[in-house]
Curated annotation (Swiss-Prot):
Belongs to the insulin family. Disulfide bonds join C54-C96, C66-C109, C95-C100. One of its GO terms (cellular component) is postsynapse. Keywords: Disulfide bond, Growth factor, Secreted, Signal. GO terms for molecular function: growth factor activity; hormone activity; insulin receptor binding; insulin-like growth factor receptor binding; integrin binding; receptor ligand activity; transmembrane receptor protein tyrosine kinase activator activity. Residues 125-138 have a biased composition (Basic and acidic residues). This is Insulin-like growth factor 1. Residues 90-110 are annotated as: A. It comes from Mus musculus (Mouse). Residues 119-153 form a propeptide.
């Protein structure tokens, strides 16, 4: 089995073959258009290599991908799985020094937090209802005294 070429490479090969078959001085405008299109496709695909994300661009990409969940700069690991751990690679190692794809970015998103289900009014307890203002009972400070006589209890 042969190696599968990319589409721009195949188009370039086809265009190059067509170009060699046709004499330059009798080339029609449609052939020139297709040749130019093939050359542009080939050159733009070879110059645009894999991109890396660093600094603010990396943070912006993570915020876009993860949304309100948030993200980690290091991969989250289990608690105390082993005393000695191998050095971890973070998102900067994977996406700034090398190129990374969308799936790699999603690996650093925080997990979804479960949302609290809104309770219906029927399910609420009576203590959840707003309290009405109660009568204020003043403490009887004159306990044990009647008139000007003081009694001890």
């Amino acid at each position: 089995m042969g190696k599968i070429s990319s589409l721009p490479t195949q188009l370039f090969k086809i265009c190059l073959c067509d170009f060699l078959k046709i004499k330059i001085h009798i080339m029609s405008s449609s052939h020139l258009f297709y040749l130019a299109l093939c050359l542009l496709t080939f050159t733009s695909s070879t110059t645009a290599g894999p991109e890396t994300l660093c600094g603010a661009e990396l943070v912006d990409a993570l915020q876009f991908v993860c949304g309100p969940r948030g993200f980690y700069f290091n991969k989250p690991t289990g608690y105390g799985s082993s005393i000695r751990r191998a050095p971890q690679t973070g998102i900067v190692d994977e996406c700034c020094f090398r190129s990374c794809d969308l799936r790699r970015l999603e690996m650093y998103c925080a997990p979804l937090k479960p949302t609290k289900a809104a309770r219906s009014i029927r399910a609420q307890r009576h203590t959840d209802m707003p309290k009405t203002q109660k009568e204020v009972h003043l403490k009887n400070t004159s306990r044990g005294s009647a008139g000007n006589k003081t009694y001890r209890m």
